[in-house]
């Protein structure tokens, strides 16, 4: 069985198909950023993206995934930190930090779907992610901050570069 995990084709044929994705990621592939919280898909610590949508990896078995694309916290940003990860640091969200990988994956998925989310959209998207330390105010602030950063950046292709570049723009749409 082949999956794409963090943009890398990955052969999982040696793993029992009834193994939860969470344990395949952690125990077999060494991707330990995704955390075990409750094991019943209620806390959100194990959140990863399945074909771009946030899901609980503790309840998905590898045998049910077909040729899916999985993104974990380790693969969220191609180079460096994702805007949500930077905002998490800048807003000092983490207290114990155990929930943050799942929280960040859920928040980044929200911003993919709703670049400028309302408080209600944030509440709905983040409802399945529990923070035992209660840093919900800082989580919301980080999501709003990341939203602002992502919306103030424009992607353009420079023929002299091999990849897309990101340049900030001001409120008038002028690249700085």
Stretches found by the model and what they are:
Residues 1-176:
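Signature of N-terminal electron-transfer/Fe-S-associated modules in redox systems
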């Amino acid at each position: 069985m082949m999956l794409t995990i963090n943009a890398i084709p990955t052969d999982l044929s040696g793993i029992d198909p009834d193994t939860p994705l969470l344990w395949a990621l952690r125990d077999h592939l060494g991707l330990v950023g995704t955390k075990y919280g409750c094991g019943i898909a209620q806390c959100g610590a194990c959140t990863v993206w399945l074909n771009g949508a946030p899901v609980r990896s503790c309840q998905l078995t590898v045998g049910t995934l077909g040729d899916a694309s999985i993104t974990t916290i380790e693969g969220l940003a191609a180079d460096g930190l994702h805007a949500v990860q930077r905002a998490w640091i800048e807003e000092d969200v983490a207290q114990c930090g155990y929930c943050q990988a799942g929280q960040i994956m859920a928040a980044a998925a929200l911003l993919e779907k709703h670049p400028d989310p309302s408080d209600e959209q944030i509440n709905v998207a983040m409802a399945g992610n529990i923070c035992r330390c209660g840093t919900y105010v800082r989580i919301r602030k980080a999501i709003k901050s990341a939203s602002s950063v992502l919306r103030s950046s424009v992607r353009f292709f420079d023929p002299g570069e091999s990849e897309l570049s990101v340049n900030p723009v001001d409120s008038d749409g002028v690249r700085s």
